[in-house]
Structure formats: C-alpha cells, structure tokens
Amino acid sequence: MAVGKEMLYDQLPADVKPRVVWREKFWLTDEALSTYRRSAGLFGHEMHSPIMSIGQGIPAIVCRWAEQTSKGDMWRTIGLGDWLFDLDQPEQAQRVPAAVLALAKDPAAARAQAARARTVVERYQRDTMAVLARKLT
C-alpha cells in the first residue's frame, strides 16, 4: 500500500487530492462492491475487482502487462476483449483513455456489455457444475 501511495496518491495535483480517498489497508469485498455499484465502471490492473464488478453487472476495463499471468485473457473469453489492454503494447496503451471515456459517456451501453459478459460467465458456471454433478453422482 505504501508503494501505491508514493507512486499514485502523492503524485496527484494538490487540487485533486481533496477528491481522492487514500486507504492504508485493503478494503473488504462488500466495501469495494458498494463503491463500484455507485460508479460508471471500473478501470484496473488486477483481476479481483473486475471479476467482482462483472459479476454485479458493473463495467470493468482491465490493463495487463507481461509480468502478470495470462488470467487477463478471460476477458476475451467472456466477450470483453475490447476492454482488455496490454500496456506493454504502446498502441494498446494509447487506446485506454478513449475506452474509459466511452464507458463513462455511454453507461447504458457499457452496462449492457457487462451484462452480456455476466451471462457468458453464468453459462460457463452452469456447464461446469453440470459436469461435476454427472461425475460425482
């Protein structure tokens, strides 16, 4: 958390800091989701919050880089390839601001896209549980 404060919060302009909340500890799942539900969507680098967001129908843009694992590929699998960016690729990194603005400017379309992805996830979950039910009975 200290690195994040130093690299992010401390670098913000003085007029922006009063509108930003810095937390010294990780928040609990319910705290995170209650905030995400009130937002236009999420933009992040780790998969936990985006997964929770899509599970609630909240749009989520994900940025990854080579040192992270391939788990970001799940965004393509569930139909959110347009919301997955490889920050090691300059042309992809340059497209991030436009994607975030599009999400914010058309929240209805973004929520519809998130809902479609959630439906895909629910189908995978049903199919997986059906396999387990067959194998375990």
What is each model feature region?
Residues M1-T137:
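Active-site anion-handling motifs in enzyme catalytic cores
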